[in-house]
Every structure is written in structure tokens, then in C-alpha cells.
Amino acid sequence: MFSSITLRQLKNSPISTLKHTRNFASTMEGFKELNVTMPKPFVYKVELNRPKKLNALNRAIWFEIGKCFDILATKDDCRSIVLTGAGKIFSAGIDLPDMIALGGKLAEHEDVARKCKILEQTLKDYQDHFTALERCPKPVIAAVHSACIGGALDLILAADIRMCSSDAWFQVKEAEIGMAADMGTLQRLPRAIGNQSLVNELCLTSRKIEPTEAKDCGLVSKVFDTRDSLVAGALEMAEQIASKSPVAVQLTKRTLVHARNNSTQTGLDFIRYWNMAMLQSEDFINAAMAQATKSPPPAFAKL
């Protein structure tokens, strides 16, 4: 495969170590309920920013989440994303006053068909905003401290990697407030932990999941002692991902997401057709040659 590549070509190729920039910081403006920053090169941090309301998920923050991740999906200076929460807890879940306001909107109509149409479109919009994390080709790492309740669990289940601090706890809250979870938990939790009996128990009883159990069952992959070490660890992993070829990383995520809902053969077809193009990328050639010659990892062009 490499016979046509000479050492001179290798020498002239853009192989160099990705430099870590100290005190690197940038902010993406235009959001009220989110704090979006770029603490490291190619790494964005999206922070739920309603600490006085325990980061409860109201209509505004829901829509901002969808908008933010759709924007980051297209930014060539974004290669990985860390999702956190400001304040005492990650998120208390659905903002109940917001739900009550929706009830008032439904009360304006007497006909059940018209009420159903409003509610169906609202739920569809909300689902789409959370699915933006999964739809985004850049890997998303959810870093959870303290409480992650109801709709917040729906949110992090759309992330690619989940980790938490030792004070974290998770709860499928919806059954306790008289509803079934409708933003992704019932669809994504079974795939995340792979134990249908445990999924049924958690969703039907609404009991809390502590960090040790969360790691043991696969809900999270890492548990950190403190919130600070959690965020630092998440950013370190995001930086590691960002140092890889964006061509490779983004196609890997797309293929993993595709594989969840398709057969093995369909998944093999999917990656084969994609790699017909991607294996011709300079990223593959440069990364492979760096490995073969034991050179430092290359710096990759924006994508």
C-alpha cells in the first residue's frame, strides 16, 4: 500500500506533533442558557448554565442544546466536545413549571386531535434537540457531577462517552411523575448497559443509581474522586481524541451510531462504501507512515 510513498515524500508531509497550547481559551457567543467555550485546541466545552435553577431543562435550554450541537457539527475547529453542568448539580431534569405552561397552551383547544398535534410536534422537536448530540459527528463526552435526573439522563445517553464524579447519581424519574420517559432513555439505556432486567428495574422503580453501580453496568466508563478531577479527566480525553485524524474519528463515530440500528452486514457495507473514499485521505497516509517510522503523531488539517 505504501510502495509509492518515498522517504522524501514522508519528510515533506505535514507530520508534526500536535502542540498543546497553554492558557488556550475561546468563547462561542449567542447562547443564554449554555456557556460554550474552547478551553483547548479543537476541544469545546458545553456547560448547562442555569445553576440557580439546578440546570433544569426548560424550553429555552432544550432548543439551545440542539442549536449548539448542530453548529459544532459543522465547525472545522471542533473535533471533540465535553458536556458539563454549572453549579451544585449536573441537572435536575425537566423544568416542571415549563411543562405546566405547555399544559396551559393545550387548554386553549377543546378538540383532542388538535391537542395531540401540538403535543406530538413539541415532543418531536424536543427529541430532535437531544438527538443532536448523537447526530453530531464530533465525539461528545458527558461529565456528570451530583444529580442527573430524568431528562438529564435522556441527554447524556445521547453522548458517546459518559463519566462521573464520586458524588454523582442517576435516576429515571419519569414514572414518579406519572409519565413514561420520552426523550431517549427507554431507547438508549438498554443499549448502554446491555442488561434488560436492570433496565426494566430502573425505569419502573425510579430508584437511584450510584457511581459504582453506574460503572459496573456500563452507564459510565470512568468515576473520578472530585468534580474538578472529573472535568480535567474529560478534557484530557477530549484532547486525546482531538489529536487524532478528524477523518478517522468522525467516520468511526458515524459507523458506531449506524451499527446500533442495523445488522452486522449492513454495517460492514456502510463502512466499506465510506472507506472507498476515506482511505485515500492524506490523514490515513500520514498517520500510517508515522506509525511505521515511529515518528511523532502528525498534525491534521481542519475538517
Predicted regions: what is each one?
Residues 60-64, 125, 132, 233, ...:
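Charged catalytic carboxylate motif
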Residues 40, 163-168, 220-269, 277-280, ...:
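C-terminal long alpha-helix characteristic of the crotonase
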Residues 50-51, 244-245, 281, 294:
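Short loop-to-helix capping motifs
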Residues 77, 85-129, 178:
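Glycine- (often His-adjacent) and acidic-residue-rich active-site loop
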Residues 88-92, 149-150, 298:
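Short, active-site-adjacent cap segments at secondary-structure transitions
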Residues 131-246:
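Crotonase-fold acyl-CoA enzyme core
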Residues 46, 50, 64-65, 83, ...:
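Terminal peptide-recognition signature
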Residues 2-86:
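Conserved CoA-thioester-binding segment of acyl-CoA-metabolizing enzymes
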